[in-house]
């Protein structure tokens, strides 16, 4: 089939290619291989997009592109259309993200994609289910944190999402509140999203550009030339930092490196060289501290699996000190306390949105951000109920014909992407 004069072919869903399936829960869902075969993208003009989709509002916008809430006119289905600027990402990276998300969609704790994949003149576009309550970052009161019952509901579901991914030998590599989507503000139903950096265990990747507070120490220390072999431990570490953030409304440190005094204090505690507790960790109970010691073990091989958090959720995680909101101002970056002396009980900084990119591969899609500073929001008041395990739902069915590859002169040419080598 040539691009200039393509032959018609029947509509098909975007599926993952490759022999075999992953064992365990969800068996039967094919996993992506390193060779993606003959995925097709249909080109739509702006007028064609508005013909099929009614714009409700813009959900987010950044240098990477934008996310729009739309209604597909054919069925009335609400969905989030993600427009990714072609200048900011490669086609193979876009297809990788869509394919991996699709392969994981059988989990009720991972965002689902619709059978909607196309391109415009400037963007690659795909559709995923709409999360009406935004993301987890939006509801965390800065320097206060969320109620413990809300946190436990969220952590339970994220642990199941990570266990599902890791059981298929896939590592998310960008776990943070911005990538956790909410269907209600009490976290009764949350889903993990944004798989643009996901890779298979053992895949060697370049060092990421810069670091964020969720980045594991071994990633911070990796050399730019050698890179790092992907391991589930980086997700477990980020999961531990995320739990700290949602409980406190603060970062535990700015970066997991020796230049950060708060991280160095934590390292001394982990190695048994600090009398007492690190200043930022005194609010936690003994069970919570044991949980953090496992999730945030300095050596990746000593970190427990993500699902290990479940046995700690039956305990109280924070003490009475947790209920006292912190009104301390952030210290300027150059005004840090000396590493040799005791640190005062103050936060290294309130939560802010973060972006991680692949080194040397151009900017990748980042989650939509309203701003670079946290927004004050009311604290949700949860109803005390046991941590729920949502029932698996049916995968969303999108409008047909988005990946059919059929020629239509009124809608531009058909672009074929064949035999793309992708490391996952």
From Swiss-Prot:
<keyword id="KW-0963">Cytoplasm</keyword>
<dbReference type="InterPro" id="IPR016234">
    <property type="entry name" value="Ser/Thr_kinase_Sbk1"/>
</dbReference>
<feature type="compositionally biased region" description="Pro residues">
    <location>
        <begin position="390"/>
        <end position="399"/>
    </location>
</feature>
<dbReference type="InterPro" id="IPR000719">
    <property type="entry name" value="Prot_kinase_dom"/>
</dbReference>
<dbReference type="InterPro" id="IPR011009">
    <property type="entry name" value="Kinase-like_dom_sf"/>
</dbReference>
<dbReference type="GO" id="GO:0106310">
    <property type="term" value="F:protein serine kinase activity"/>
</dbReference>
<dbReference type="InterPro" id="IPR008271">
    <property type="entry name" value="Ser/Thr_kinase_AS"/>
</dbReference>
<feature type="active site" description="Proton acceptor">
    <location>
        <position position="174"/>
    </location>
</feature>
<keyword id="KW-0418">Kinase</keyword>
<keyword id="KW-0808">Transferase</keyword>
<dbReference type="GO" id="GO:0004674">
    <property type="term" value="F:protein serine/threonine kinase activity"/>
</dbReference>
<protein>
    <recommendedName>
        <fullName>Serine/threonine-protein kinase SBK1</fullName>
        <ecNumber>2.7.11.1</ecNumber>
    </recommendedName>
</protein>
<comment type="similarity">
    <text>Belongs to the protein kinase superfamily. Ser/Thr protein kinase family.</text>
</comment>
<dbReference type="GO" id="GO:0005524">
    <property type="term" value="F:ATP binding"/>
</dbReference>
<feature type="domain" description="Protein kinase">
    <location>
        <begin position="53"/>
        <end position="318"/>
    </location>
</feature>
<keyword id="KW-0547">Nucleotide-binding</keyword>
<feature type="binding site">
    <location>
        <begin position="59"/>
        <end position="67"/>
    </location>
    <ligand>
        <name>ATP</name>
    </ligand>
</feature>
<comment type="function">
    <text>May be involved in signal-transduction pathways related to the control of brain development.</text>
</comment>
<keyword id="KW-0067">ATP-binding</keyword>
<feature type="binding site">
    <location>
        <position position="82"/>
    </location>
    <ligand>
        <name>ATP</name>
    </ligand>
</feature>
<dbReference type="GO" id="GO:0005737">
    <property type="term" value="C:cytoplasm"/>
</dbReference>
<feature type="region of interest" description="Disordered">
    <location>
        <begin position="390"/>
        <end position="412"/>
    </location>
</feature>
<keyword id="KW-0723">Serine/threonine-protein kinase</keyword>
<dbReference type="Pfam" id="PF00069">
    <property type="entry name" value="Pkinase"/>
</dbReference>
<feature type="region of interest" description="Disordered">
    <location>
        <begin position="321"/>
        <end position="373"/>
    </location>
</feature>
């Amino acid at each position: 089939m040539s691009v200039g004069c393509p032959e018609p072919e029947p509509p098909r869903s975007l599926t993952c290619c490759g022999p075999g399936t992953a064992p365990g829960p969800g068996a039967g869902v094919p996993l992506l291989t390193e060779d993606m075969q003959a995925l097709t993208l249909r080109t739509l003009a702006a007028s064609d997009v508005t013909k099929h989709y009614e714009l409700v509002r813009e959900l987010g916008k950044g240098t990477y592109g934008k996310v729009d809430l739309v209604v597909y006119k054919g069925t009335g289905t609400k969905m989030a259309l993600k427009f990714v600027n072609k200048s900011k990402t490669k086609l193979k990276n876009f297809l990788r993200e869509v394919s991996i998300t699709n392969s994981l969609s059988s989990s009720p704790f991972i965002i689902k994609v619709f059978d909607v994949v196309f391109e415009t003149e400037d963007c690659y576009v795909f559709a995923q289910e709409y999360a009406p309550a935004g993301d987890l970052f939006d509801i965390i009161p800065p320097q206060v944190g969320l109620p413990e019952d809300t946190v436990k509901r969220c952590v339970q579901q994220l642990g199941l999402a990570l266990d599902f991914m890791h059981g298929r030998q896939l590592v998310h590599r960008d776990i943070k509140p911005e990538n956790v989507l909410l269907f209600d503000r009490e976290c009764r139903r949350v889903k993990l999203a944004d798989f643009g950096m996901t890779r298979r265990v053992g895949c060697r990747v370049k060092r990421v550009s810069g670091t964020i507070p969720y980045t594991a120490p071994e990633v911070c220390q990796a050399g730019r030339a050698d890179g790092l072999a992907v391991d589930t431990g980086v997700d477990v570490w980020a999961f531990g930092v995320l739990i700290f953030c949602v409980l406190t409304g603060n970062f535990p440190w700015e970066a997991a490196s020796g230049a950060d005094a708060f991280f160095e204090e934590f390292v001394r505690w982990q190695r048994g060289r600090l009398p007492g507790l690190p200043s930022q960790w005194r609010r936690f109970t003994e069970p919570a501290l044991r949980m953090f010691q496992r999730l945030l073990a300095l050596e990746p091989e000593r970190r427990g699996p993500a699902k290990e958090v479940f046995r700690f959720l039956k305990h109280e995680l924070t003490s009475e000190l947790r209920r006292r909101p912190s009104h301390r101002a952030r210290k300027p970056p150059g005004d840090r306390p000396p590493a040799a002396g005791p640190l005062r009980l103050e936060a290294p900084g309130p939560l802010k949105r973060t972006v991680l990119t692949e080194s040397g591969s151009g900017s990748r899609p980042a989650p939509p951000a309203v701003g670079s500073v946290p927004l004050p929001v009311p604290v949700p008041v949860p109803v005390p109920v046991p941590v729920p395990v949502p029932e698996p739902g049916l995968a969303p069915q999108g409008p047909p014909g988005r990946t059919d590859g059929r020629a239509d002169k009124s809608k531009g040419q058909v672009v074929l992407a064949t035999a793309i080598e992708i490391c996952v």
